[in-house]
């Protein structure tokens, strides 16, 4: 008779990992899940194996709110090598084209405004986007190119940091769904020399503080102490995933109704509408709801209440 599968801990929160280079986001997420002995985990937007930086990992009930971090703005620092294009638009790919680089700082500064604002971007073939149920990168590795539709993105800011030819370093503040490799490839084409990513670091997701990140080596040192309570001190609260939403505090009666998934009519002196994060009369995070124009709270995503 097979032994019952061991269940992890019911631990909830968000761990801010400084992802190491060379590991996939899913692989490192599974490692973090094992370190915390969590029963459930999910990351909030994959980073390429080449990339490092902020990777929020949601544990337990926090996985219910991971979509809010997937949808959040991101910030990156990227270094590109001008003069070479690769099939993946980064240093892990094969060089497919080499050109002379006759670009100076003024050329770069003149080009950057063309890549700020609302843009349409065609995703790279080397992406996890799916076509007929299969990731695009599987087609790409088989030498098959699939027609991709351009998708709307927003580059809120694109700043020049340094240029030591042929290496260009930029800072990017962008919307969800932005492929930095594609942005660099497009910029290289605009400059007439081609380019690919050599270094990519995610510096921010939503409003999470950089100083709250922990690298993998430090986490392993903590894990070796076999003190779960010590590890748990490094988790951010579940509601941090939705901190961009306005908070709505409920009384005891309202809290109880919401916890059962019921809609609640309430006095709304501030005329608050749209998505909100809900807190009980005891300051417990209840979840996310929608306040409609009739001052009715409609639950959307709720924490599981212990009974």
Swiss-Prot record:
InterPro entries: PsdUridine_synth_cat_dom_sf (IPR020103), PsdUridine_synth_N (IPR002501), PUA-like_sf (IPR015947), PUA_sf (IPR036974), tRNA_psdUridine_synth_TruB (IPR014780), tRNA_sdUridine_synth_fam1_C (IPR015240), TruB_C (IPR032819). The keyword Chaperone does not apply. Transmembrane segments: none annotated. The active site is at residue 48. The keyword tRNA processing applies. GO terms for molecular function: RNA binding; tRNA pseudouridine(55) synthase activity. It catalyses: uridine(55) in tRNA = pseudouridine(55) in tRNA. Its EC number is 5.4.99.25. It comes from the Bacteria. GO terms for biological process: mRNA pseudouridine synthesis; tRNA pseudouridine synthesis. Keywords: Isomerase, tRNA processing. Signal peptide: none annotated. Belongs to the pseudouridine synthase TruB family. Type 1 subfamily. Responsible for synthesis of pseudouridine from uracil-55 in the psi GC loop of transfer RNAs. This is tRNA pseudouridine synthase B. It comes from Pasteurella multocida (strain Pm70).
């Amino acid at each position: 008779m097979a032994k019952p599968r061991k269940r992890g801990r019911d631990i909830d929160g968000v761990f801010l990992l400084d992802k190491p280079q060379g590991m996939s986001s899913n692989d490192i997420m599974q490692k973090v899940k094992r370190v915390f002995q969590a029963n459930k985990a999910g990351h909030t937007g994959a980073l390429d194996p080449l990339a490092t930086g902020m990777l929020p990992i949601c544990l337990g009930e926090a996985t219910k709110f991971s979509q809010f971090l997937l949808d959040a703005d991101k910030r990156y620092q990227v270094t590109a090598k001008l003069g070479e294009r690769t099939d993946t638009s980064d240093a892990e790919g094969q060089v497919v084209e080499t050109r002379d680089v006759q670009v100076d700082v003024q050329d770069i500064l003149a080009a950057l405004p063309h890549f700020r604002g609302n843009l349409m971007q065609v995703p790279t073939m080397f992406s996890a986007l799916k076509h007929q149920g299969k990731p695009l990168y599987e087609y790409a590795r088989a030498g098959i190119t699939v027609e991709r539709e351009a998708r709307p993105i927003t580059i809120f800011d694109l700043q020049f940091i340094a240029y030591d030819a042929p290496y260009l370093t930029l800072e990017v503040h962008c919307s969800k769904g932005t492929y930095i490799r594609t942005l660099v490839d497009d910029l290289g084409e605009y400059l007439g020399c081609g380019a690919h990513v050599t270094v990519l670091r995610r510096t921010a997701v939503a409003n999470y503080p950089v100083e709250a990140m922990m690298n993998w080596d430090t986490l392993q040192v903590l894990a070796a102490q076999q003190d779960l309570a010590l590890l748990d001190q490094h988790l951010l609260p579940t509601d941090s995933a939705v901190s961009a939403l306005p908070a709505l505090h409920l009384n005891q009666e309202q809290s109880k109704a919401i916890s059962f998934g019921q809609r609640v009519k309430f006095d709304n002196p501030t005329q608050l509408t749209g998505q909100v994060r809900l807190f009980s009369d005891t300051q417990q995070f209840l979840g996310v709801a929608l306040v409609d124009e009739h001052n009715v709270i409609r639950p959307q995503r709720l924490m599981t209440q212990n009974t």
